[in-house]
Amino acid sequence: MAVISKVTYSLYDQKEINATDIIISHVKNDDDIGTVKDGRLGAMDGALCKTCGKTELECFGHWGKVSIYKTHIVKPEFISEIIRLLNHICIHCGLLRSREPYSDDINLKELSGHALRRLKDKILSKKKSCWNSECMQPYQKITFSKKKVCFVNKLDDINVPNSLIYQKLISIHEKFWPLLEIHQYPANLFYTDYFPIPPLIIRPAISFWIDSIPKETNELTYLLGMIVKNCNLNADEQVIQKAVIEYDDIKIISNNTSSINLSYITSGKNNMIRSYIVARRKDQTARSVIGPSTSITVNEVGMPAYIRNTLTEKIFVNAFTVDKVKQLLASNQVKFYFNKRLNQLTRIRQGKFIKNKIHLLPGDWVEVAVQEYTSIIFGRQPSLHRYNVIASSIRATEGDTIKISPGIANSQNADFDGDEEWMILEQNPKAVIEQSILMYPTTLLKHDIHGAPVYGSIQDEIVAAYSLFRIQDLCLDEVLNILGKYGREFDPKGKCKFSGKDIYTYLIGEKINYPGLLKDGEIIANDVDSNFVVAMRHLSLAGLLSDHKSNVEGINFIIKSSYVFKRYLSIYGFGVTFKDLRPNSTFTNKLEAINVEKIELIKEAYAKYLNDVRDGKIVPLSKALEADYVESMLSNLTNLNIREIEEHMRQTLIDDPDNNLLKMAKAGYKVNPTELMYILGTYGQQRIDGEPAETRVLGRVLPYYLPDSKDPEGRGYILNSLTKGLTGSQYYFSMLVARSQSTDIVCETSRTGTLARKIIKKMEDMVVDGYGQVVIGNTLIKYAANYTKILGSVCKPVDLIYPDESMTWYLEISALWNKIKQGFVYSQKQKLAKKTLAPFNFLVFVKPTTEDNAIKVKDLYDMIHNVIDDVREKYFFTVSNIDFMEYIFLTHLNPSRIRITKETAITIFEKFYEKLNYTLGGGTPIGIISAQVLSEKFTQQALSSFHTTEKSGAVKQKLGFNEFNNLTNLSKNKTEIITLVSDDISKLQSVKINFEFVCLGELNPDHSLFEKKQDRYVVDIIVNKLYIKRAEITELVVEYMIERFISFSVIVKEWGMETFIEDEDNIRFTVYLNFVEPEELNLSKFMMVLPGAANKGKISKFKIPISDYTGYDCFNQTKKLNKMTVELMNLKELGSFDLENVNVYPGVWNTYDIFGIEAAREYLCEAMLNTYGEGFDYLYQPCDLLASLLCASYEPESVNKFKFGAASTLKRATFGDNKALLNAALHKKSEPINDNSSCHFFSKVPNIGTGYYKYFIDLGLLMRMERKLSDKISSQKIKEMEETEDF
């Protein structure tokens, strides 16, 4: 099949429609011949096509036609285009509307684009009546009437026949088409002789109801039947037009309907393009519950007998396989035989006679039950990233469930509580070969961005790894017993006693080094905990092995160690009983007594405070402060429990070192003091969205407590532990949280899935080019992919070593640090980076040596400097900054830290060049990789409890998915959270006083109203000065609040005001008022709204506290800073303040408006990264890539839009935009087939690599070189001859 490089869209012309010879002329018929269900329109439901005789898999259908008897029917989707054209011509004479007469001898093709635009403006500028002296009629405005379903004259609502419009449009001369932006013959906007009937394939029969009668058909078929019926009756133009519109897009004439039509099935997320072409249901698939198996490796998947006997795989007949196929036929193992010459598939059954069908010629194939070791794709949904779908070798296993190795459970996000997985057996040999390499677990061992292994030990294996390392005094037989089948090659080296460390050294099997962890393949760490054996850890032994050698060794270690850990457990056993958790009741009784005592003290103190407030002895705190103090007391109680449990664990470890529960804690598996607190101590405060449950009827959550009770237990503090059990009310509070979480999970799954799909669609065509740059189409996004031009799975986070005077080359390192340090102080100077990105894990090649054997200090510096200069020029073309790489090598290989030999240094830099040369291939789909990693992580977060909000000063800054969603949607005209940071608190206080909302009611005023005296009302407002001070305002501000409210009040006619100091604690504001009529009513209104309406600042439910924190200027320079967050629409509101030396951190749109697109990109990148929280620094690269794409043009663009990136028509159509194909056809667009979506449609391999280079030879270049060389040799020979002649 020829490779299609370009596609052009256009409208069907009438000749193409008329060319089909399948005429549809009946509404009903006994055998459906001549109806819209005619068998000649394609194969359906197992029946062969009556036109081509093929099955529904091979026949793509045939078009029919129904006569419309010379009626002109408008193609419904182009009604607006016809109205646009009619606005440019006179409906009477058909000439172009113009202010002045124009000549028809203009050659528009010779005009430049600018000249054409000027002519267009001149000719098409409007005038009221036609310039044609033979017409002179006023121009008519033509519109389409939804009610009459035809074109009408807007002035008098008189029908304008389609035939008249047709004649006027086709009479426009072709030379004027560029002026009117007509791209093809206007007749194509109409159906004239025949209307096309689409093939059966797009309208499969389904059951639905019409007028309470069940129909076994398709709604499109039903609508087509109505068109045929009206055409047979030779109905009016409007009747046929209406039937065609109902079939095409009913929304053109009716807004409140949702019936299925062509527009409906090609738009939205259930469009046919997405459901039947981009992805569809497949044969040779299976689905079952999954379970673990200890007998299969990471590279295998266990398949039960019933799936093996159902799925079949093809064996193609050729010279190599013909004998095998004959054997299979003889042994009755063949299920199907396909004869290519006869184009016939034969099912082979026991005892069935087959005559002249089996020829076994090349190209034929047989289907047999799937065999062991065949590669099969399997995965668990939701498939959030590529580690959820892998291709492994089939193994036969017992039982009825699919078996997977526990080592891959993490990457599949699978547990064994009823999870299901699907599997598909690909039939194409090319697909099988491709999947068996690119989707094989060994290939996928290391995470694309994180760089750590995605496979590793789970559950009991972690404890086994810990216990095995600690075991001592093993004899050889015991070692060989633990090693099992892997013990054959174990070399005792003359020793009689062995430890767990020796077993690990044997399993590692390589002379590998790593600072503080490995020395010559031997573990030098104190313990082996979960960090060494589980997935997604940078210290994973499997990861270090694969960094040192290859993924094969890494996977091999996982397989061997998993087997050994399981054997260790089966020999020595491991179990946790309730006795391990709670040897006796002494400790839990003690904890319970402490908890009861403390909660009573808290309640007592709280009750005393409430009584004192009621009696007027003290001034009450604000509600927020009161809640904070209560919460802080309860948190102290929780922390007390944790401290007691930590002490208990420490003591138990001394008394009972073999306690299995504590072994788990030490191994880093499952057990931590907080979880033990729930079981043994207290279940703690239950929260919904980060807050205690809100009170409801009678000021309480549950009827277990008195109305308006302030009891902390009545707001969800559960005192009991799970060991003691929960009371009725406590159980209710725990279920309240469970209910809100389950609801959140249901909703968030949908939201995260939607955004994930949008991000992948946005980033899918972003690839690495041959120079290691990131491009999308012809647009350059990043100069250096992954910053290092090395595959993301090869890059490695390493410790960031800060400059120190004890270092060799201190001055050079300091100078480099000063150039790059800005990138390591981030998040408004609150955080200092502890890690940085190394181009590869060179630390596994660092072998310490003695001073005598070490490379000279100057030689090592020169080597590092020369390598970096060479790489900067040859690989990064001096365009990208790679100072960070030089800094890493200078600090980590610093002679003051470690001495290495010259050979070690050469090895490290040879590996560096190797990674630069061979890991990151042109075409690597870095966009899809980044999009999947981002999406997988925010989905996991949204489904965990991470999306609770965090109080960041005043405004609750949303964390997690919500904020990420807002950032990528980039909504304009919304308030943004502005952060102000300064070391001078007074500058922030002036902003706070102006913006913080304070109303009179918050100051707990004492109102008193005197009767009307001397024709005026007197209102006394007495406020305690303590409340004014607590609100951080002054008496003058309170006076201003009252004055401002009264002066703007429309119900006050006249007013006056006096301020008095009542006593040392109180101040009195006396207001004199006259109201407009009706006075009594307005007085009541005034008194009612006074507490809330007399206010200052921006109305908000949040306060604006100023918090202090330690800010970093450098790793060794900190200072006290004050921070305040405020919600503003625009930074102009800050214009009247003195903000000198105040750092203002605006939102994304304010950043863009002030500093431009590059600053917006940096803001977006950091803001998106911050939504993930701690420990996700490795997501910086995908966040940066997404931010760079959103800011690739002059203005930030939402993930929902493709305004700047030239998204192809097929990509838009796949995305659910059914207008994309219509517009492309109307404008006769031509587009290259480059992007993923377009390649999918035209069976073209997308321009995406696999991380490997494609090598090719440019023969033309060789020929040119050959000519140059021959010319050079010729000239050299002539020169030599001339010199000889001279002698």
Swiss-Prot record:
- What catalytic reaction does the record list? RNA(n) + a ribonucleoside 5'-triphosphate = RNA(n+1) + diphosphate
Going by the UniProt record, its keywords in alphabetical order are: DNA-directed RNA polymerase, Nucleotidyltransferase, Transcription, Transferase, Virion
Give the similarity note: Belongs to the poxviridae DNA-directed RNA polymerase 147 kDa subunit family.
Protein name listed in UniProt: DNA-directed RNA polymerase 147 kDa polypeptide
Give each disulfide bond as a residue pair: none
Quote the cellular component terms of the Gene Ontology held in the record: DNA-directed RNA polymerase complex; virion component
The task this protein performs is described as: Part of the DNA-dependent RNA polymerase which catalyzes the transcription of viral DNA into RNA using the four ribonucleoside triphosphates as substrates. Responsible for the transcription of early, intermediate and late genes. DNA-dependent RNA polymerase associates with the early transcription factor (ETF), itself composed of OPG118 and OPG133, thereby allowing the early genes transcription. Late transcription, and probably also intermediate transcription, require newly synthesized RNA polymerase.
Q: State the InterPro entries in the record.
A: DNA-dir_RpoC_beta_prime, RNA_pol_asu, RNA_pol_N, RNA_pol_Rpb1_1, RNA_pol_Rpb1_3, RNA_pol_Rpb1_4, RNA_pol_Rpb1_5, RNA_pol_Rpb1_clamp_domain
The EC category is transferase
Gene3D superfamilies reported in the protein's UniProt record: 1.10.132.30, 2.40.40.20, 6.10.250.2940, RNA polymerase ii, RNA polymerase II, clamp domain
State its location(s).
Virion
SMART domains found in the cross-reference section: RPOLA_N (SM00663)
**One Pfam family in the UniProt entry:** RNA_pol_Rpb1_4
Which terms does the UniProt entry file under GO BP?
DNA-templated transcription; DNA-templated viral transcription
EC number of this enzyme? 2.7.7.6
What quaternary structure, including any partners, is listed in this protein's UniProt entry?
The DNA-dependent RNA polymerase used for intermediate and late genes expression consists of eight subunits Rpo30/OPG66, Rpo7/OPG90, Rpo22/OPG103, Rpo147/OPG105, Rpo18/OPG119, Rpo19/OPG131, Rpo132/OPG151 and Rpo35/OPG156. The same holoenzyme, with the addition of the transcription-specificity factor OPG109, is used for early gene expression.
What GO MF annotations does this protein's record show? DNA binding; DNA-directed RNA polymerase activity
